[in-house]
Amino acid sequence: MAREFSLEKTRNIGIMAHIDAGKTTTTERILFYTGRIHKIGETHEGASQMDWMEQEQERGITITSAATTAAWRDHRINIIDTPGHVDFTVEVERSLRVLDGAVTVLDAQSGVEPQTETVWRQATTYGVPRIVFINKMDKTGADFLYSTGTLKERLGANAHPIQMPIGAEDEFHGIIDLITMDAYFYLDDLGQRSETREIPAEYKDEAEELRASLIEAVAETDEELMMKYLEGEEISNDELKTAIRQATLNVDFYPVLCGSAFKNKGVQLMLDAVLDYLPAPTDVPPIEGIIPGTEEKVTRPSSDDEPFSALAFKVMTDPYVGKLTFFRVYSGTLDSGSYVKNSVKDKRERVGRILQMHANSREEISRAYSGEIAAAVGLKDTSTGDTLCDEKNLVILESMDFPEPVISVAIEPETKADQDKMAIALSKLAEEDPTFRTETNPETGQTIISGMGELHLDIIVDRLKREFKVGAQVGAPQVSYRETFRGSAEVEGKFVRQSGGRGQFGHVWVKFEPNEEGAGFEFENKIVGGVVPREYIPAVQQGIQESMENGVLAGYPLIDIKATLYDGSYHDVDSNEMAFKVAASMALKAAKNKCKPVLLEPMMRVEVVVPEEYMGDIMGDVTSRRGRVEGMEARGTAQVVKAFVPLSEMFGYATALRSNTQGRGVYTMHFDHYEETPKSITEEIIKKNAGE
């Protein structure tokens, strides 16, 4: 099977936005106009093509980034629809890793919102070129220039309109192209028929003004164009487009477009802009990787002739075909039925079938080419972030970093039959989502699940019940506290057991001290003269690390400490690894009374957006939750409160905010750092945990 679309005519894009900016609807329209769907599904009717999990259709939000493929003007566009809710930023992070470009969708009334800032920052980290689509121009309060301004004010982005709307709200009739200076008027409800006319007289001045400042902004990124501009020479449309493309690819400039996906206006022009300004796989630098075992850096250019390399960026359990692994091919080609190497796990994998995904329907293909996104059936050992490569040309591509979960709940099966099913289902869900963890509490035997927020865990439990038919009861959410030391001390750990026959003997002196915040655990061996034999040193480190998992104060993991092993003794016959492991854990317990242990709680960065009149109530509420207000700013007609609040005080906040603001307030929160818990609360937690 020959390649249908050349690499130069391929685009891998993501669509990213704040929740409710109209991202899924925009994707729907793209699929409609590119001939992939025959009937348009509305998100608010729960019938959207991309939102294919039942929970997504009910809640009207996008949870998993479904990958789909479409064709436009003899190009292939692979689209990844990413979720806009902050609990799912891992999905965004994961998809940005494999994209070449992105469309940021903004709400024309609100402009840049908190989650837009989060995904924008993530896209900047990965150097992803972006165009901006200002959606909902038909909405009451829509203001194109205000929304464009928020890109500069809130994100510091060099963003500039390359289009302007004709009218707004109910009077939104068409779009002016600021490059060609043509006006497009829409003639039917589906937006499939439009006609090009002259710019209406009342818009002419504004259009010319915006075009002049567009040329100026683009000229600043291109020396040749700057010279022409300064010398007053005419700049042709083609020159302008080429310069915009180059500046966009360099992530120096962001073209801004407008429309209303719901009213079917502006989507085709936005698709044109995807082809005109966003990169093909050949426009982005070749991906870097290392050769396993040597740490030698190599690059894998986008080409079918290079050795095969791909990154698995999502694993899903599909009711029909089982485990589906989504991957992006960076170089070479992959045939179904072939063998590849998972270089991260050093495992050989057989690729059963290769599927090209379209939201939740699929088409089987025999070969995936470089630059393409597809899904494989039959990979047993591959998880998110793993590299798949040619067995003779091993490489490990840059992987992804995922945040630690911050919230946990206990979950119990309803019946004995549910118990076995639950274990299998939870491990499948954990395989799909690296920010979801499942573990068994060794003391209580309870199953604990952890994730990025209440909504995240709600949806996991929901999926257990629906997809895996597991009956389960969920406890109250628990905060993932941590412990650390504030003081340092030298302590002894001695484990001696002599009771006839071979005994046990391990003896260590360890200095424990605080480490820098975020530096983790550090172990230093300062043994001189073999007072603790070399072969037992790893056991000492292991003994300390294993004990750290259960802390010294209230049973929470100890973090950011340094342990220096500097003295000890051993017995020729009775010493062994186990004895030194136990001695090391005894030393850690002895440090409890000397190293001033403290409890740390996760602090969340919270942003609350509310109408002015509710400010007083919101500030009072944040303070009553032990929150620290960091700042306030006006955002359009609303006020934004930025604060740090302990996670333990944020449970049920969504409900409180709704009732405090009559449903008009919204908030986002994500984990920021750990802070020492106040003494009274620490005592309460210690008592509670001791009493259990």
From Swiss-Prot:
<dbReference type="Pfam" id="PF00679">
    <property type="entry name" value="EFG_C"/>
</dbReference>
<dbReference type="InterPro" id="IPR000795">
    <property type="entry name" value="T_Tr_GTP-bd_dom"/>
</dbReference>
<feature type="domain" description="tr-type G">
    <location>
        <begin position="8"/>
        <end position="282"/>
    </location>
</feature>
<feature type="binding site">
    <location>
        <begin position="17"/>
        <end position="24"/>
    </location>
    <ligand>
        <name>GTP</name>
    </ligand>
</feature>
<dbReference type="Pfam" id="PF14492">
    <property type="entry name" value="EFG_III"/>
</dbReference>
<dbReference type="InterPro" id="IPR053905">
    <property type="entry name" value="EF-G-like_DII"/>
</dbReference>
<dbReference type="InterPro" id="IPR000640">
    <property type="entry name" value="EFG_V-like"/>
</dbReference>
<dbReference type="InterPro" id="IPR005225">
    <property type="entry name" value="Small_GTP-bd"/>
</dbReference>
<dbReference type="GO" id="GO:0003746">
    <property type="term" value="F:translation elongation factor activity"/>
</dbReference>
<feature type="binding site">
    <location>
        <begin position="135"/>
        <end position="138"/>
    </location>
    <ligand>
        <name>GTP</name>
    </ligand>
</feature>
<dbReference type="GO" id="GO:0003924">
    <property type="term" value="F:GTPase activity"/>
</dbReference>
<dbReference type="InterPro" id="IPR005517">
    <property type="entry name" value="Transl_elong_EFG/EF2_IV"/>
</dbReference>
<dbReference type="InterPro" id="IPR004540">
    <property type="entry name" value="Transl_elong_EFG/EF2"/>
</dbReference>
<dbReference type="Pfam" id="PF03764">
    <property type="entry name" value="EFG_IV"/>
</dbReference>
<dbReference type="GO" id="GO:0005525">
    <property type="term" value="F:GTP binding"/>
</dbReference>
<protein>
    <recommendedName>
        <fullName>Elongation factor G</fullName>
    </recommendedName>
</protein>
<dbReference type="InterPro" id="IPR009000">
    <property type="entry name" value="Transl_B-barrel_sf"/>
</dbReference>
<dbReference type="Pfam" id="PF22042">
    <property type="entry name" value="EF-G_D2"/>
</dbReference>
<comment type="similarity">
    <text>Belongs to the TRAFAC class translation factor GTPase superfamily. Classic translation factor GTPase family. EF-G/EF-2 subfamily.</text>
</comment>
<dbReference type="InterPro" id="IPR031157">
    <property type="entry name" value="G_TR_CS"/>
</dbReference>
<dbReference type="GO" id="GO:0005737">
    <property type="term" value="C:cytoplasm"/>
</dbReference>
<dbReference type="Pfam" id="PF00009">
    <property type="entry name" value="GTP_EFTU"/>
</dbReference>
<dbReference type="InterPro" id="IPR009022">
    <property type="entry name" value="EFG_III"/>
</dbReference>
<keyword id="KW-0547">Nucleotide-binding</keyword>
<keyword id="KW-0648">Protein biosynthesis</keyword>
<dbReference type="InterPro" id="IPR020568">
    <property type="entry name" value="Ribosomal_Su5_D2-typ_SF"/>
</dbReference>
<keyword id="KW-0963">Cytoplasm</keyword>
<comment type="function">
    <text>Catalyzes the GTP-dependent ribosomal translocation step during translation elongation. During this step, the ribosome changes from the pre-translocational (PRE) to the post-translocational (POST) state as the newly formed A-site-bound peptidyl-tRNA and P-site-bound deacylated tRNA move to the P and E sites, respectively. Catalyzes the coordinated movement of the two tRNA molecules, the mRNA and conformational changes in the ribosome.</text>
</comment>
<dbReference type="InterPro" id="IPR014721">
    <property type="entry name" value="Ribsml_uS5_D2-typ_fold_subgr"/>
</dbReference>
<dbReference type="InterPro" id="IPR035649">
    <property type="entry name" value="EFG_V"/>
</dbReference>
<dbReference type="InterPro" id="IPR027417">
    <property type="entry name" value="P-loop_NTPase"/>
</dbReference>
<dbReference type="InterPro" id="IPR047872">
    <property type="entry name" value="EFG_IV"/>
</dbReference>
<keyword id="KW-0251">Elongation factor</keyword>
<dbReference type="InterPro" id="IPR041095">
    <property type="entry name" value="EFG_II"/>
</dbReference>
<keyword id="KW-0342">GTP-binding</keyword>
<feature type="binding site">
    <location>
        <begin position="81"/>
        <end position="85"/>
    </location>
    <ligand>
        <name>GTP</name>
    </ligand>
</feature>
<dbReference type="InterPro" id="IPR035647">
    <property type="entry name" value="EFG_III/V"/>
</dbReference>
<dbReference type="GO" id="GO:0032790">
    <property type="term" value="P:ribosome disassembly"/>
</dbReference>
